[in-house]
Amino acid sequence: MRDASKVVEETFAEMRWRCLSLAADLDRIQRASDGGKVLSSDARLNKLRAALQALLGPEPDRAERVQMIFSDTTPPPNR
């Protein structure tokens, strides 16, 4: 098993870039003409907020929990 400090060292730059990219995307949405309304009401962005909360929590298996947030749990249509 690798040392946690080594994992941080190897992945920090990419994690930082992903955070900055997400922040820039949210800023672009907010600056759009209806951005404030969309930021507060769009179901996709609500899922993104839930995913960010899952990332911030101390519980393990963050990737699985985030995947479940974005998974479509709607039953398939009857054929």
What kind of region is each of these model predictions?
Residues M1-R79:
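Surface-exposed peri-terminal alpha-helical interaction modules
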